[in-house]
Amino acid sequence: MISINLIKLTSITNGILYCSNYATLHSISIHSITTDTRKITPKCLFIALIGKNFDAHMFVNEAISKGAAALLLEKQCYPKNVIPQIIVQNTTIALGKIASWIRDQTNATVIAITGSSGKTSVKEMTSSILKNCGNTISTFQNLNNNIGVPLTLLNLNKSHKYAILELGANYPKDIEYTTKITKPNIALINNIYHSHLAGFKSLFGVAQAKQEIFLGLRKNGIAIYNKDSNYWSKWKKNLLTQKIINFSIKKNSTIFASNITTSNQGSKFKIHSPNGEIYVTLPLLGYHNISNALAAATIAISINIPLEIIKIGLSSLPILKNRLQIIRLNKYKTIINDTYNANTASMIVAIKILENISGYKLFVAGDMLELGKNDVLYHKIIGNTIYNSNINEVFSIGKLSKEISIASKKGHHFYNSDELLKNLKNKLLNKKIITILVKASRSEKLDVIVEQLIKEYHKA
């Protein structure tokens, strides 16, 4: 982080500073900022955030006892002679203002990524490429909201060459807020699918929300979009920049893929670009990951990263936990853990992947959440898709996923995880060659069932 003194912090946040000795203020320099008292370090500013179900002002005493140098609060909690305090109207907004100021102090190329799915994968792929070219920072895990994005920006310093940020949204204006803090040099929309419909109401609502990312794009910035996705023509109309690049799995775009071959180890394909062509090996399953790789490659190509570096970055990707993560129990028995997230598009992708694997195929489905008033219909659509596939059997758990089992006509619904686990274990033990793919929204916690299943299998 770039250090800031308290006078400057007060100015940035439009706050009121309370301190027992104003003469020493210029000598008090903040070297780190946290919203978590477990991460208090010397010369640290503690920001007390307030949410729907919490108020971090209750942890101010702990922050002081652990050695925080100053506090940023919405209400003065202690006499000013205890510790310097900056009082603001809204600590979450103040956090964003500080992050925006820090972003402006660096010359890093800032890349912002959004989309209905694949944001984290594209972020990780882009990071894997760019870290070979300079000091790179990226969003930790999927902390992509109005708090997570500023917290990532706080870690920027003048040594960073690249910053890769994931921008998520549940409602309109969410991305407009984070992109205006981020002020990206490059902004990318990966795709538009039916997701978070409780907040966006329709696919068009999703598209409108995602295109907000371009509102923060810097002058002469680069806009990138997936030509295979919905509503891309509307994004293009609203762009102010002239630097627009598209990518596609098909041959109708600036950057595209050809000669695609897939296996249960990943895929191989050729990337075509204005800078040349190159074959790439990707150690991830699914056509959607080829599209994600093209997104990352397009970002890199837009800033003239050599194709060989792109090839190295994509081929050396780390395993992405809970995202089509392959777990081989032995030569014949495999679990594919895809419990990171779920919407209709990613469910269909998972079904297609399982279809192309030999042996007995068992699809385990949990609920897809935040799909709005048509959520039952979307679960039935997934069930119908499985019915028309070569998948042998479906296990489901959750309030909505029962519709998947019913519509598939080859499903069994379970009302508790113990019964599901017991039946999964029996399938693993009794089928000679079997692949079990587990898919659900993250909050359904089917990743826990995957971990338990692995343990139970090895005990048997």
From Swiss-Prot:
Keywords: ATP-binding, Cell cycle, Cell division, Cell shape, Cell wall biogenesis/degradation, Cytoplasm, Ligase, Nucleotide-binding, Peptidoglycan synthesis
Sequence positions that bind ATP: G115, S116, S117, G118, K119, T120, S121
The reaction(s) this protein catalyses: D-alanyl-D-alanine + UDP-N-acetyl-alpha-D-muramoyl-L-alanyl-gamma-D-glutamyl-meso-2,6-diaminopimelate + ATP = UDP-N-acetyl-alpha-D-muramoyl-L-alanyl-gamma-D-glutamyl-meso-2,6-diaminopimeloyl-D-alanyl-D-alanine + ADP + phosphate + H(+)
InterPro entries: Mur-like_cat_sf, Mur_ligase_C, Mur_ligase_C_dom_sf, Mur_ligase_cen, Mur_ligase_N, MurCDEF_CellWall_CoF430Synth, MurE/MurF_N, UDP-N-AcMur_synth
EC number, as in UniProt: 6.3.2.10
Family: Belongs to the MurCDEF family. MurF subfamily.
Protein's job: Involved in cell wall formation. Catalyzes the final step in the synthesis of UDP-N-acetylmuramoyl-pentapeptide, the precursor of murein.
Protein name: UDP-N-acetylmuramoyl-tripeptide--D-alanyl-D-alanine ligase
